[in-house]
A protein has these predicted regions:
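Gly/Thr-rich phosphate-binding beta-strand-loop-beta motif of the actin/hexokinase/Hsp70
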Residues: 1-24, 79, 195-240, 540-562
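Early-domain small/polar-rich strand-loop-helix modules and first-structured segments
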Residues: 1-100, 238, 244-250, 256-259, ...
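Conserved phosphate-binding loops in N-terminal lobes of ATP-dependent enzymes
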Residues: 42-149, 295, 302, 327-330, ...
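Gly/charged contiguous loops adjacent to phosphate- or pyrophosphate-bearing nucleotide/cofactor binding elements
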Residues: 77-80, 87-94, 102, 112, ...
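Hydrophobic, small-residue-rich alpha-helical packing segments that form membrane-like cores
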Residues: 132, 152, 162-215, 221-222, ...
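Conserved helicase motor "Helicase C" RecA-like lobe of SF1/SF2 P-loop NTPases
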Residues: 161-165, 388-402
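Glycine-rich phosphate-binding/hydrolytic loop that grips phosphoryl groups
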Residues: 178-198, 255-260, 350, 354, ...
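Acidic low-complexity intrinsically disordered segments
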Residues: 235, 316-350, 354-355, 430-577
Length: 577
């Protein structure tokens, strides 16, 4: 079982062997020998690529960042550029002044992110496969189950792009060999084993578990996304997803805010900063990577400055005016850029209110949608950004009296370890459907309700209504995972020798027609059932039964021609239009 936490800033991987009859993998091994990484220090490789002409990959991960300066990446006229954070281009968030430059790790306006994702995952897959075979020489590729995590904020389209990119990168296409897990699901799986640590002076070092907790919320705080999923826990310890939502925010947006609010003014304003991006792009990258390392020092009551290393490669390009101003404000220190404690907090404060608002909204939804004796509710922080003491403090103060805030013991690796546990034994029993899903049918026409333009008279004289929406599941319903919904359909005309199903979705809970505003086809293909072998039967006996089941991140349909028992299984690929 291999778990991959494909993150905006960094990517981690871990594995564990499957043991028959054992419900949990036990010891999980982290991959820590990424190309260009510091052994024993870098748990993750950077989600970065060094590309030439936007097609040829020159380097990936840490190596891409290390080789960028010597390759003149990002310089005027250079065909080479360093990109990272491209995952966020699948669901970009408008941001004032956003560009496709990758400073502080957010290339979130890429035109073709799927190409970059495929290229990066190809190198990850090949590296991990070689590492696994070094430990297990007789291991066959088809004996490995892979689990790649995705943000809960992603919709069907983004998850399908991710699955297609993984397949194109070499991950197996065999059913069940590649799972996609929502990042909060992975964190929740791990927390059930690792336990939690409560936040705040009133809980110094206090540890706890999810045993006895009937409902809780996971706030997965990553580099580019804040994903929230709300759960209840059934009597067997399995998770029932109640609600989920996410936003494009996180640790790397703090970096972007520091650039806009602090560094741009210190280095001479917008125009001057744009000039520096042209003449010293990697020096600015290094400055912000230094901040990435040191921003963990920011606390609610910290007073010390954070000193960012001012390399000569940047200093020599600063204007005289900027150099003099820095010299005067920093007691003559010309080797660093000083960030005051208040300036550092201002970067966090540009991002945290959006997180608090989302948590507040989801906490209200959790209370509205469930009943529980647990008071106050548990809000569990996970992900790399959850290591921020300032974020923990702000959230604890905001929720004081309404919820207890906790973190997982190792926020940086709980998603990847949870991905291994998820692959080993998925514990999500049910999910709340984000959409109403269904298919198009002809139903009996109702005069006074259905428009005459939809009236269809069959060859047998029946008055039918075209374009009716036949529902598989309604938006907001709790849907058991992999438990099929069964529906039976018959042809409209005696001459029909095939039955074609087109699949639709909408946010509307009770849609009547498939052409209602907001209804859309969501699959890349229709499903056609050949009725030739049943044409000798009465019309009612030419029925087709659909078995529709909702998997962890996909919809599966099995159609059966009842007269012969012939099956037409398919996994619906969500449209990436």
């Amino acid at each position: 079982m291999v778990g991959i936490d494909y993150g905006t800033y960094g990517t981690a991987a871990a594995w564990a062997p499957f043991k028959q009859g054992q419900p949990d993998p036990g010891r999980i091994t982290l991959f820590e020998q990424w190309p260009g990484s510091r052994i024993g220090v870098d748990v993750k490789t950077m989600t970065a690529l060094l590309v030439k002409d936007d097609r040829e990959i020159l380097a990936w991960g840490h190596s891409a960042v290390q080789q960028a300066p010597s390759s003149r990446a990002g310089r005027p006229g250079s065909p080479v550029r360093l990109v990272h954070g491209f995952k966020m281009s699948l669901a970009p968030r408008p941001y004032p002044g956003a560009t496709s430059h990758s400073e502080i790790g957010l290339a979130d306006n890429e035109a073709h992110p799927e190409r970059l994702i495929t290229g990066f995952l190809r190198h990850v897959y090949q590296t991990l496969l070689a590492e696994l075979r070094a430990h297990l020489p007789d291991l066959e590729e088809n004996e490995i189950r892979w689990c790649v995590t995705v943000p809960a904020m992603w919709g069907d389209r983004e998850k399908q792009i991710m699955r297609d990119a993984a397949h194109a990168a070499g991950f197996p296409r065999t059913e069940g060999c590649l799972l996609l897990a929502l990042e909060p699901d992975a964190a929740a799986h791990n927390a059930q084993v690792s336990g939690v640590q409560y936040v705040g002076a009133e809980h110094p070092g206090r540890r706890g578990s999810l045993d006895g907790v009937s409902r809780f919320m996971v706030v997965d705080c990553g580099g580019g996304t804040i994903d929230i999923t709300c759960y209840t826990i059934d009597g067997n310890g399995y998770l029932v997803e109640i609600d989920r939502e996410g936003i494009a925010q996180g640790s790397l947006y703090v970096n972007r805010a520091l650039r806009d609010l602090v560094l741009v003014p210190k280095l001479g304003g917008q125009e001057e900063y744009r000039r520096l991006e042209q003449v010293a792009p990697h020096a600015l990258e290094e400055l912000l990577r230094d901040w990435e390392i040191k921003k963990g020092r920011v606390t609610p009551d910290s007073t010390d400055h954070i000193w960012l290393d001012l390399k000569m490669s940047l200093a020599k390009h600063l204007s005289d005016e900027v150099t003099e101003r820095l010299d005067a404000s920093q007691d003559g220190d010309d080797e660093n850029i000083w960030i005051t404690a208040d300036e550092a907090r201002s970067a966090f404060d540009a991002v945290i209110p959006d997180i608090l608002e989302l948590v507040d909204r989801k906490l209200a939804d959790l209370t509205r949608l469930t009943t529980a004796a647990d008071k106050p509710d548990l809000v569990l922080l996970a992900g790399g950004f959850a290591q921020s003491r300032y974020l923990r403090h702000r959230l604890r103060e905001y929720l004081r009296g309404r919820a207890v805030v906790a973190v997982t013991p190792q926020p940086q690796v709980d998603v990847v370890e949870g991905a291994v546990r998820f692959a080993y034994n998925p514990k999500v029993r049910a999910r709340r459907s984000q959409y109403t899903y269904g298919t198009e049918i002809c139903a009996p026409f109702e005069h006074g309700t259905d428009p005459l333009g939809k009236l269809y008279r069959s060859g047998m004289g029946k008055e039918l209504c075209r374009d009716r929406f036949d529902v598989f599941v309604n938006a907001g319903d709790i849907v058991p995972v992999d438990k099929p919904t069964v529906l039976e359909f018959v042809p409209v005309e005696r001459t029909d020798d095939a039955m074609t199903f087109t699949f639709y979705r909408t946010k509307e809970r009770e849609p009547r027609y498939v052409d209602n505003e907001g209804c859309e086809e969501f699959a890349t293909c229709d499903l056609t059932i050949d009725l030739t072998e049943a044409m000798h039967l009465e019309l009612e006996k030419r029925s087709v039964t659909l078995h529709v089941s909702f998997g962890e991140t996909e919809l599966r349909v099995r159609a059966v021609l009842d007269a012969t028992g012939e099956e037409y299984p398919t996994t619906l690929k969500f449209s990436t239009r």
